[in-house]
Regions:
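Short S/T/G/P-rich N-terminal loop/turn motif that feeds into the first structured element of a domain
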Residues: 1-49, 56-70, 77-105
Length: 105
C-alpha cells in the first residue's frame, strides 16, 4: 500500500466549514481506483489540518491527485495561507512524496 499526506493551515474561525468539506470529500475518494481509506485530522485551535489517504498501489496514489483537485478547491476559501505546492496537492510547505505503508495496526 501507498499513502499521500497533505497538510494545510485553515482559518480557525471557519473550523466547522473545514470539517464539513472534509466529511463531504469522502465520496470523491471512494470513487477512485485503488482507494483504501482516508483520514482527515484537524486542530480547531490552530487551524492545522492533515489528510492521510491510503491506496493499493503507487500508481493508484499518483493517479488520484488530479481527480481530487476539486476537493482541494473546496477547502480554498478557508485557507489561512495559500498552499505553495504543485497543482492537485495542497501543502503549505511543499508537496510530500507518496509513501509506502510499511507497518500498520
Amino acid at each position: 500500500m501507498y499513502a499521500h499526506i497533505a497538510r494545510a493551515r485553515f482559518q480557525p474561525e471557519h473550523s466547522d466549514d473545514v470539517i464539513q468539506v472534509a466529511r463531504d470529500s469522502i465520496d470523491a475518494y471512494r470513487e477512485l481506483a485503488g482507494f483504501v481509506r482516508v483520514t482527515h485530522l484537524y486542530d480547531r485551535a490552530s487551524g492545522w489540518g492533515f489528510a492521510l489517504s491510503t491506496w493499493q498501489t503507487e500508481a493508484d496514489a499518483k493517479a488520484a491527485v488530479m481527480p481530487l483537485a476539486s476537493v482541494t478547491d473546496r477547502f480554498a476559501p478557508y485557507w489561512a495561507e495559500h498552499p505553495s505546492s504543485e497543482p492537485g496537492f495542497f501543502d503549505v510547505i511543499g508537496a510530500l512524496p507518496t509513501f509506502e505503508v510499511v507497518a500498520e495496526s
